[in-house]
Amino acid sequence: MPSIRLADLAQQLDAQVHGDGDLVITGIASMHSAQPEQITFLSNSRYREQLASCNAGAVVLTEADLPFCKVAALVVENPYFTYARMAQIMDTTPQPAQDIAPSAVISPQATLGEGVSVGANAVIESGVVLGDNVVIGAGCFIGKNTHIGAGSRLWANVSIYHEVVIGQNCLIQSGTVIGADGFGYANDRGNWVKIPQLGSVHIGDRVEIGACTTIDRGALDNTIIGNGVIIDNQCQIAHNVVIGDNTAVAGGVIMAGSLKVGRYCMIGGASVINGHMEICDKVTITGMGMVMRPITEPGLYSSGIPLQPNKMWRKTAALVMNIDGINKRLKAVERKIDKE
């Protein structure tokens, strides 16, 4: 990790320095593991008592928490956001090789922009267009007539099927598959007949997609992922789904076909969302949410029974299974009381 003077780091972060600005910072760490040459952050005042035992050389925090800090500090309004910027400055992610590996297979009919990097054993088919400074990791497959915008990076073993469009400055982690056939079949007297998926996948700018996520191509229209969307690992996005700008999707989410999700939504991990319906803008669904109906009002939504000791859970489940009968008995009692 690169080293930097605390005063220089503060200047880049628009932070106020309190303490020794000449302190050399060599890394970022959590509050419980940070060493004197490292910097940490306090984003929630509930944990300010941890400052007393923290061994970090410096802490990023708010003005309100500064009196509790015994070492150098960078004072900011939003410590967590500042931590994100600080991590970008001190990022240790290896830079890709600025070349095309000899073992890469690139069609003569593909178009590569300036500064494109292609890793070992990658395959780029005819009609592909790669913008400037695109990085294609080792073992990637880029299907015919796919377009990838400038500055986007695919880590190793990403598969992009034919005619997919990916915008600028996107990041796609290893094992992800984009543009595979959607789950489209017709039934003819008990026999399943495959419906070729004639649409594609269009992904906007600044989209980040985690490892081993699958985004299916549309049946007729395109599957669309808006600008600034972030999708975690192992998500399934079915054909013709539309996800609005700046929505966040946590790990293990399943979205059924033709679902439309609005902008600025947050979908909690392991949620399952029915297809052929809409979720409006600014909806938050907590983890393991099961969404069976459209959501038309912004807000926080939850479903399911939180974890309980098994004996208590069995009783709760029994009550839920018998809720209709309990409701009928309650109404009968109410009618009896009304008559009296």
UniProtKB/Swiss-Prot annotation:
A molecular function (GO) term: N-acyltransferase activity
Name the reaction it catalyses. a UDP-3-O-[(3R)-3-hydroxyacyl]-alpha-D-glucosamine + a (3R)-hydroxyacyl-[ACP] = a UDP-2-N,3-O-bis[(3R)-3-hydroxyacyl]-alpha-D-glucosamine + holo-[ACP] + H(+); UDP-3-O-[(3R)-3-hydroxytetradecanoyl]-alpha-D-glucosamine + (3R)-hydroxytetradecanoyl-[ACP] = UDP-2-N,3-O-bis[(3R)-3-hydroxytetradecanoyl]-alpha-D-glucosamine + holo-[ACP] + H(+)
What does the subunit comment say? Homotrimer.
- Signal sequence span is none
Concerning Gene3D superfamilies, the annotation shows: 1.20.5.170, Hexapeptide repeat proteins, MurE/MurF, N-terminal domain
Alphabetic keyword roster: Acyltransferase, Lipid A biosynthesis, Lipid biosynthesis, Lipid metabolism, Repeat, Transferase
| Matches recorded under PANTHER family | UDP-3-O-ACYLGLUCOSAMINE N-ACYLTRANSFERASE (PTHR43378), UDP-3-O-ACYLGLUCOSAMINE N-ACYLTRANSFERASE 1, MITOCHONDRIAL-RELATED (PTHR43378:SF2)
Entry keyword annotation includes Acyltransferase = yes
- Extract the PROSITE patterns matched here: HEXAPEP_TRANSFERASES
| Cellular component terms per the entry's GO annotation | membrane
What functional role does this protein have?
A: Catalyzes the N-acylation of UDP-3-O-(hydroxytetradecanoyl)glucosamine using 3-hydroxytetradecanoyl-ACP as the acyl donor. Is involved in the biosynthesis of lipid A, a phosphorylated glycolipid that anchors the lipopolysaccharide to the outer membrane of the cell.
Q: Name one Pfam family in it.
A: Hexapep
This protein's pathway: Glycolipid biosynthesis; lipid IV(A) biosynthesis; lipid IV(A) from (3R)-3-hydroxytetradecanoyl-[acyl-carrier-protein] and UDP-N-acetyl-alpha-D-glucosamine: step 3/6
Q: Can you say what this protein is called?
A: UDP-3-O-(3-hydroxymyristoyl)glucosamine N-acyltransferase
The positions flagged as active site in the entry are 239
EC number(s) on file: 2.3.1.191
Asked if Coiled coil is a keyword of the record, the answer is: no
